[in-house]
């Protein structure tokens, strides 16, 4: 039979000849069609899972998938009948020669193995041909073996195709890593043993490339001793070993696959391994080589500091570990490679690393025997299966492969070609670390990672959901099956810890159900088929939705079914299940769906980690995030947020009961170690919980348990932690916290009552800080700090960023942040400008945040000691999704967004951080970092940051960051407004409903004596006694009648305030004005609508509340003044009248009435109000606190602002006329018209020079400074002495036109003034000069001293200076 494969993007044209063979019912000697004792190692199973062969040669053609003839990867389930295709005939009838070839493969190779042959049977020759997928070469395989001619011809064709596709297609880094793994695994020769378990050698000439030939091309091979250099650590002795996942000791790294890495294991008392680049490895020759290596590294150091660091001796914490590694390396150097590998290769038990028992014993580390490790690991696996007693069809595919590898490894123990660095994986308890081990100094995570099959199947579905889009984008031409295989290849490269990140709520429940299944019966096996067929057992699942869960569990069971029929289609069902999750509501539980692999979210249900973190002292701890390692030294940092993310997710699941109306179960935390677990509850008043170990107890005490404080009756204050003075307990029953009254008064959330006080742990600080007047009610789940009286509502909206969640209802708040010495990003920093005026100078800096102010801008004096801004005193904290400015290092203040720790990439989550720190995302640069409250401040609308925004380098990045920050700020603002609107539309803000005014503080309510109440003249026989249409004297004077005084008695209709006769109204949500009040029936003009009631406060309290409202940006408040000593505040307490809005054209008015001697305010209709109309009144009546608040009443005469008088009809008409009036045309002045011409000579002496001009309009006088008696120019507007009286300086009325002499009315009498012919007057001085022949001299009218007219008390100004000609 001959058929050809046409050329396609996935294959190279080949002609394959196959001989028709007789089918037999037995396969490899099994009577029932099943393989028995067929031992196939892991390399073979991996290879077979990636080879594509026809299930039946009788079909005549090969399978086609998506139009392609060959596929690069297929699961092992599709090839389970491979033996029926190849090994036909009787058992051991054929001499099959398996040769797996790969070009450019450098790795470990083992001698090939063959099965027995039988004379007379046709010979089957298998050759795997190199195929191409998207222009990328895969491995080779085909059924042939005629010599080197076919090989060289195929190599030539492959080289041509490879060169062609390399020019046309771009290489994929992620795909290349999978490609290399496939090449390496294909190069490893697998061993298939006969039913009799006989090992038959293979002729070496059957394979042109053996593993030994490939090893000669590599610089290092398995078992070689090397020095490795990892940043931050000295040169360390290592041994090259094979990676337990890739089953290879080398791989190519980098964008162009130009850098080679080797897998090494570090010598020492802690088993740790890593991938190291070849340039960081040097062959090990002895300890004396260390100094030389340090000197060579120092010569290549880029900076002097780095050089000093490299030459520095090994620190004390690493010295013991390093010296032990040197001893082990020198011992290994004296051994042969096989002995070295046998003794020093790590044991991979389960998913953990362990030292060889012999090495651990020499190092003084106590470990369990290997047999006990295997026994103890059986409980953590799915079930302990005996290969000899359980049929192979009852073993799942994954576990069957593990069993085959175990048996294969045992049989290959004496084979020198067998790789001993990859023993069978067994779950084992971690051995005790050595004292000097850096990994031993790490805090363990408290629970081992799960490896249950139910979890693995569910995790794979989540993995497919998240990363399907990525793979499809990289391989658009691939079919669905190919995408499934690529995803499976990526999944197989992850270790158990990385796989655990893809847990879901469903996988948790399935895992628990699997554990129950494993405990049923004798523990030997589980009947998945029976459980899948019996849906009655699903009733035990308590979580909702049941229907979707049952469907998912059914699909997961189908994936794990062992029968041949379901194994063939399991991978397709997994694809369908994963894709269906995208279109169902289950995507809500998979919050990380459709996110790239780099930024995937962390697992929401992994085991919670312990608080605290210690820096690793091993070289492998400095590996990059892309390196794959199973060593304990590569575990993520055990930061407070690790447990925070998990606890919050678990809390959100458990809180569903409370959403259905049931109270959530309280989770207690130990008061000593602040951790959860099995706790002992105190039955005393403190309601505390403790671990037995924390109390020093070995077992639970009998009877009633009380802690030491409750037993002694001396409790410590929860704030100051001291018990010297008297403490009082919170009145809430289950609280149990004690406080000094002085300490608890410092917190504004403390509520004092008649029986005591309610502590701040029962109110949300975020809700109070955002709206102190109307905070959100304390109902709902609260998360309380275990160290101080701070509490928040559960959820990201209220919980402050930086809080460490230690239980579903317990946190450690950000107030307990401790700055570490030597860390620059922990230092506090303040801005260099005022937050009010944006100017520098002498600033008052906040001690908790970067805020700074001028004391004058805050209207306060410069305080002594520490000072905190208003926001910090009020308890305002940053929340997730807040846009902020961050100061990091030497960079400018940079815009960023506060991120939740579970929404950042895994490498950012692993960064070491303290309680109170939170991750931020920098706009523009797309970077992340951990920071805290003292280095950030909120972003405000309109912020522009630094003015230095260039078009190159960091300036351009900063400009883009500002644009991104502004867009994100507006987006988050709209989201929050929509959420607040949705919440506010449900019901009005909370307040306390009262019926009459409640006095506050010193305010009193007056009550008059009955004899003082006026009596009206109404009679009970009148039609409407004391009604609105009657002539009741009390009604006219706005007095309410008293029932014991009014003649009408019970028929009196002037008792609306006392009887509260209000028309029926309802509260509604208005457009743009918040909540309002509408009438439900028609209201007549003058009818009483409602009484305005609230808290009665005095003026001092009123001003204090207004000041507090201004400081905290509270705008929704209204104070109504009754008289000088009493003001009504209806904010915290009131009735329906508090919802009435303002209007410049209202339908109600406020009137002061006297009721039983006390003044009260009533609302009366000023016009007929139909039903459904909103009730409004004018707030301008004796109101305080409204400063230019925009009015939104929409009336025609709206003034625009609250507090301003509404526009009258006259003003409206004048405005209309003004708008219609045309602008008057103005006559243009001629050039020079209206300008005055100043004199060029001094008005006193008549000479020219530098003159001072008078600033008075139309005055042209000019003077010398010496003539005015001045030494410098006058400042400001200056008028010459001619305009002021020479005696008193008042404005002059009589002027001399020849000199500056002038006088006012009072002093002009007695002065001789004469007039010239042109009407100008002159003084007597000029008359004497004119008439020199006169015999009689006129006496001077004023002393000589008064003639000095330049020295005036008024401020003068220089206006203009001219030069005389």
From Swiss-Prot:
Residues 552-567 have a biased composition (Basic and acidic residues). Residues 149-169, 373-455, 513-567, 594-658, 1206-1232, 1329-1365 are annotated as: Disordered. Keywords: Chromatin regulator, Chromosome, DNA-binding, Metal-binding, Methyltransferase, Nucleus, Phosphoprotein, Repeat, S-adenosyl-L-methionine, Transcription, Transcription regulation, Transferase, Zinc, Zinc-finger. GO terms for cellular component: chromosome; nucleolus; nucleoplasm; nucleus. Residues 603-623 have a biased composition (Polar residues). Residues 1219-1230, 1348-1359 have a biased composition (Basic residues). It comes from the Eukaryota. Induction: Induced in CD4(+) T-cell in response to T-cell receptor (TCR) and CD28 stimulation (at protein level). Induced in B2-cells by IgM antibodies or lipopolysaccharide (LPS) stimulation. S-adenosyl-L-methionine binds at residues 1075, 1115-1118, 1141-1142, 1186, 1192. Belongs to the class V-like SAM-binding methyltransferase superfamily. Histone-lysine methyltransferase family. SET2 subfamily. This is Histone-lysine N-methyltransferase NSD2. It comes from Mus musculus (Mouse). The lineage of its organism: Eukaryota, Metazoa, Chordata, Craniata, Vertebrata. The gene is Nsd2.
């Amino acid at each position: 039979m001959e058929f050809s494969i046409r050329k396609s993007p996935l294959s190279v044209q080949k002609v394959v000849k196959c001989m028709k063979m007789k089918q037999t019912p037995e396969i490899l000697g099994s009577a029932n069609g099943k393989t028995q004792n067929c031992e196939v190692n892991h390399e073979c199973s991996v290879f077979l899972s990636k080879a594509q062969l026809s299930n039946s040669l009788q079909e005549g053609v090969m399978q086609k998938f998506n139009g392609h003839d060959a596929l690069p990867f297929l699961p092992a389930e599709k090839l389970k009948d491979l033996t029926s295709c190849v090994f036909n005939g009787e058992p051991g009838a054929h001499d099959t020669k398996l040769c797996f070839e790969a070009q450019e493969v450098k790795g470990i190779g083992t001698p090939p193995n063959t099965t027995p042959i039988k004379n007379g049977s046709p010979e089957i020759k298998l050759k795997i041909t190199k195929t191409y997928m998207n222009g990328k070469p895969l491995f080779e395989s085909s059924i042939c073996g005629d010599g080197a001619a076919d090989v060289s011809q195929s190599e030539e064709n492959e080289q041509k195709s490879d060169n062609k596709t390399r020019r046309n297609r771009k290489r994929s880094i992620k795909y290349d890593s999978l490609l290399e793994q496939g090449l390496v695994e294909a190069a490893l020769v697998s061993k298939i043993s006969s039913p009799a378990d006989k090992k038959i050698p293979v002729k070496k000439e059957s394979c042109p490339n053996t593993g030994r030939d490939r090893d000669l091309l590599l610089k290092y091979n398995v078992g070689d001793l090397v020095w490795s250099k990892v940043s931050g650590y000295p040169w360390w002795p290592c041994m090259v070993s094979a990676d337990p996942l890739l089953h290879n000791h080398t791989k190519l790294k980098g964008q162009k696959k130009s850098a080679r890495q080797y897998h090494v294991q570090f010598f020492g008392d802690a088993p740790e391994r890593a991938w190291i680049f070849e340039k960081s490895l040097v062959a090990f020759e002895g300890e004396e080589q260390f100094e030389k290596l340090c000197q060579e590294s120092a010569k290549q150091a880029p900076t002097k500091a780095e050089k000093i660091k490299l030459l520095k001796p090994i620190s004390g914490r690493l010295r013991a570990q390093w010296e032990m590694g040197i001893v082990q390396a020198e011992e290994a150097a004296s051994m042969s490679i096989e002995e070295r590998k046998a003794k020093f290769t790590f044991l991979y038990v389960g998913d953990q690393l362990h030292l060889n028992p012999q090495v651990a014993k020499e190092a003084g580390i106590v470990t369990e025997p290997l047999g006990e490790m295997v026994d103890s690991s059986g409980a953590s696996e799915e079930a302990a299966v005996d290969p000899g007693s359980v049929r192979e069809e009852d073993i799942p595919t994954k576990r069957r492969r593990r069993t085959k590898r175990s048996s294969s490894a045992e049989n290959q123990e004496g084979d020198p070609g067998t790789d001993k660095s990859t023993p069978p994986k067994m779950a084992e308890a971690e051995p005790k670390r050595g004292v000097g081990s850096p990994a031993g100094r790490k805090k363990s995570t408290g629970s081992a990672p799960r490896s249950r099959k139910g979890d693995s199947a569910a995790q794979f579905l989540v993995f497919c959901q998240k990363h399907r889009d990525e793979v499809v984008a990289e391989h658009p031409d691939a079919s669905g099956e190919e995408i499934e295989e690529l995803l499976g290849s990526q999944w197989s490269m992850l270790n158990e810890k990385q796989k655990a990140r893809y847990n879901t709520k469903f996988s948790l429940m399935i895992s628990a159900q699997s554990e129950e299944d494993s405990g049923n019966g004798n523990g030997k096996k589980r009947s998945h088929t029976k459980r899948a067929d019996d849906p009655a057992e699903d009733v035990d699942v308590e979580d909702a939705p049941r229907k979707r869960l049952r469907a998912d569990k059914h699909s997961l069971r189908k994936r794990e079914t062992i029968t041949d029929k379901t194994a063939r289609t399991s991978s397709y069902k997994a694809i369908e299940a994963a894709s269906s999750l995208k279109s169902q509501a289950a995507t809500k539980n998979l919050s990380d769906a459709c996110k790239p692999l780099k930024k995937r979210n962390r697992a929401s249900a992994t085991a919670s980690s312990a608080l605290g973190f210690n820096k690793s002292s091993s070289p492998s701890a400095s590996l990059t995030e892309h390196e794959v390692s199973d060593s304990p030294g590569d575990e993520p940092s055990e930061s407070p947020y690790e447990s925070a993310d998990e606890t919050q997710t678990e809390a959100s699941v458990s809180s569903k009961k409370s959403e259905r109306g049931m109270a959530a179960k309280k989770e207690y935390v130990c008061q000593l170690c602040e951790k959860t677990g099995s706790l002992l509850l105190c039955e005393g008043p403190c309601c505390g919980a403790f671990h037995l170990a924390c109390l020093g107890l070995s077992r639970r005490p009998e009877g009633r348990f009380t802690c030491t404080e409750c037993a002694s009756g001396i409790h410590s204050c929860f704030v100051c932690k001291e018990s010297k003075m008297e403490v009082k307990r919170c009145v809430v029953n289950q609280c149990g916290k004690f406080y000094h009254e002085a300490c608890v008064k410092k917190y504004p959330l403390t509520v004092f009552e008649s029986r005591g006080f309610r502590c701040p742990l029962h109110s949300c600080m975020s809700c109070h800080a955002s709206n102190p007047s109307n905070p959100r009610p304390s109902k709902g789940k609260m998360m309380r700090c275990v160290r101080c009286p701070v509490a928040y509502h559960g959820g990201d909206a209220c919980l402050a960023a930086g809080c460490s969640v230690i239980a579903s209802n317990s946190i450690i708040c950000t107030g307990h942040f401790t700055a570490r010495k030597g860390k620059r990003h922990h230092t506090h920093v303040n801005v260099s400008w005022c937050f009010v005026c944006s100017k520098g100078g002498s600033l008052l800096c906040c001690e908790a945040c970067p805020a700074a102010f001028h004391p004058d801008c805050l209207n306060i004096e410069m305080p002594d000691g520490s000072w905190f801004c208003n926001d910090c005193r009020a308890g305002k904290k940053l929340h997730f999704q807040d846009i902020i400015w961050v100061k990091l290092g030497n960079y400018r203040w940079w815009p960023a967004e506060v991120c939740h720790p579970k929404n950042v990439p895994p490498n950012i989550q692993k960064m070491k951080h303290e309680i109170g720190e939170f991750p931020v995302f920098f706009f523009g640069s797309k970077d992340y970092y951990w920071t805290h409250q003292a280095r950030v401040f909120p972003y405000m609308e309109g912020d522009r940051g630094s003015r230095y925004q260039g078009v190159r380098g960091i300036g351009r990045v900063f400009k883009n960051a500002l644009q991104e920050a502004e867009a994100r700020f507006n987006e988050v603002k709209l989201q929050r407004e929509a959420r607040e609107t949705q919440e506010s539309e449900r019901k009005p803000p909370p307040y306390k409903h009262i019926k009459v005014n409640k006095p506050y503080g010193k305010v009193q309510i007056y009550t008059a004596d009955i004899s003082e109440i006026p009596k009206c003249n109404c009679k009970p026989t009148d039609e409407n006694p004391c009604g609105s249409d009657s002539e009741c004297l009390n009604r006219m004077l706005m007095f309410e009648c008293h029932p014991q005084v009014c003649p009408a008695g019970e028929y009196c209709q002037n008792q609306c305030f006392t009887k509260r006769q209000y028309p029926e109204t309802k509260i509604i949500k208005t457009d743009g004005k918040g909540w309002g009040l509408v009438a439900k029936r028609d209201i007549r003009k003058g009818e009483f609508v409602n009484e305005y009631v609230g808290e009665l406060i005095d003026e001092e309290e009123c001003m204090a509340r207004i000041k507090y409202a201004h400081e905290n940006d509270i705008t929704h408040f209204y104070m109504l003044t009754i008289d000088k000593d009493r003001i009504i505040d209806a904010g915290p307490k009131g009735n329906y009248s508090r919802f009435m809005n303002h209007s410049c054209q209202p339908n109600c008015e406020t009137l002061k009435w006297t009721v039983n001697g006390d003044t009260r305010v009533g609302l009366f209709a000023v016009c007929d109000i139909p039903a459904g109309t909103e009730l409004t009144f004018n707030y301008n009546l004796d109101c305080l606190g409204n400063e230019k608040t925009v009015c939104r009443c929409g009336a025609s005469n709206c003034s625009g602002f609250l507090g301003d008088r509404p526009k009258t009809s006259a003003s409206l008409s004048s405005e209309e006329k003004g708008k219609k009036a045309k602008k008057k045309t103005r006559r243009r002045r001629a050039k020079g018209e209206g300008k005055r011409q100043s004199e060029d000579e001094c008005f006193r002496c008549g000479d020219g020079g530098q003159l001072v001009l008078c600033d008075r309009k139309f005055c042209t006088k000019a003077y010398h400074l010496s003539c005015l008696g001045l030494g410098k120019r006058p400042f400001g507007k200056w008028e010459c002495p001619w305009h002021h009286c020479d005696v008193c300086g008042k404005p002059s009325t009589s002027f001399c036109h020849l000199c500056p002499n002038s006088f006012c009315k009072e002093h002009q009498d007695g002065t001789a003034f004469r007039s010239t012919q042109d009407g100008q007057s002159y003084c007597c001085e000029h008359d004497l000069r004119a008439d020199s022949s006169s015999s009689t001299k006129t006496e001077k009218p004023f002393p000589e001293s008064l003639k000095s007219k330049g020295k005036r008390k008024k401020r003068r100004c220089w206006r203009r200076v001219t030069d005389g000609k």
